[in-house]
């Protein structure tokens, strides 16, 4: 009888393809331009996952058929953003964010063109970048009318950005935490089609919001099941009571702070 045996996870050996990709990561970057786009795509994914994608590498590997880019751990600059103009098939984009880059690493001018010609874009994350302004969001909404997820916490947006976002009738998830929005902006956001489509809303750390915002959300966002409004010092117990009255029974995630 065997006692005390323990199971250990078995390490899977790398495939030949993975080994070849690891070797390809080591070749001179100017050789990347001669690679087929399918191989460029795999190299791009591997390097971005490792946070090894720089402006130089980006310039050689980016191509028009790219559909997903997760750059949150990559150190690129305005020059790298320029290369994104060719990615007309892009569906998912996560931009670099602090502390990997400085919050002012990307200028408003470079970000203004981010949504041009990207009608297929569904998910975009621009968290922590002060270059993200109302103008940038307006341009993004104009070029990407089918956006479903927008993550723009800790940016420079105001209520004007929420007015633009209110036009995204397919918007399901919105993160606008730690911004200078107010009750008026929230009311403008949820009073239209967005109120019917939103499933997740994160407004944590928005110090200008009051109970009026929570009331608007509870009345208008009929399908909401994730709501985060912790660290909002102007909210009172009334907000929690409103959520209990209208939404608590259907919530999957709910966070708030008692002051």
Region roles according to the model:
Residues 1-75, 79-82, 87-89:
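Cullin-RING E3 adaptor/co-adaptor recruitment helices
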Residues 34-41, 128, 154, 205, ...:
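Short amphipathic alpha-helical segments embedded in low-complexity Lys/Glu-rich regions
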Residues 62-64, 85-88, 109, 116-119, ...:
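Inter-repeat linker/turn residues at the boundaries of leucine-rich repeats
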């Amino acid at each position: 009888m065997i006692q005390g045996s323990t199971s250990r996870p078995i390490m899977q050996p790398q495939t030949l393809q993975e080994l070849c990709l690891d070797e390809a990561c080591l070749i001179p970057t100017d050789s990347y331009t001669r690679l087929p786009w399918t191989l460029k795509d795999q190299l791009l994914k591997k390097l971005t996952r490792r946070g090894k994608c720089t402006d130089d590498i980006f310039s050689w590997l980016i191509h028009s058929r790219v559909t997903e880019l997760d750059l949150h751990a990559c150190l690129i600059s305005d020059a790298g953003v320029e290369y994104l103009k060719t990615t007309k098939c892009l569906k998912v984009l996560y931009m670099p964010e602090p502390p990997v880059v400085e919050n002012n690493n990307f200028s408003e001018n470079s970000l203004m063109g981010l949504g041009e010609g990207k009608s297929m874009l569904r998910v975009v994350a621009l968290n922590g970048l002060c270059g993200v302004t109302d103008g940038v969001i307006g341009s993004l909404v104009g070029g990407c009318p089918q956006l479903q997820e927008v993550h723009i916490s800790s940016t420079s947006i105001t209520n004007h950005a929420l007015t633009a976002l209110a036009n995204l009738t397919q918007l399901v998830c919105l993160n606008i935490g730690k911004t200078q929005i107010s009750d008026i902006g929230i009311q403008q956001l949820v009073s239209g089609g967005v109120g019917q489509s939103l499933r997740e809303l994160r407004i944590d750390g928005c110090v200008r919001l009051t109970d009026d915002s929570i009331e608007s959300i509870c009345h208008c966002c009929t399908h909401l099941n994730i709501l985060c409004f912790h660290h909002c010092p102007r909210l009172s117990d009334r907000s929690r009571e409103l959520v209990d009255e209208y939404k608590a029974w259907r919530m999957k995630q709910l966070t708030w702070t008692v002051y």
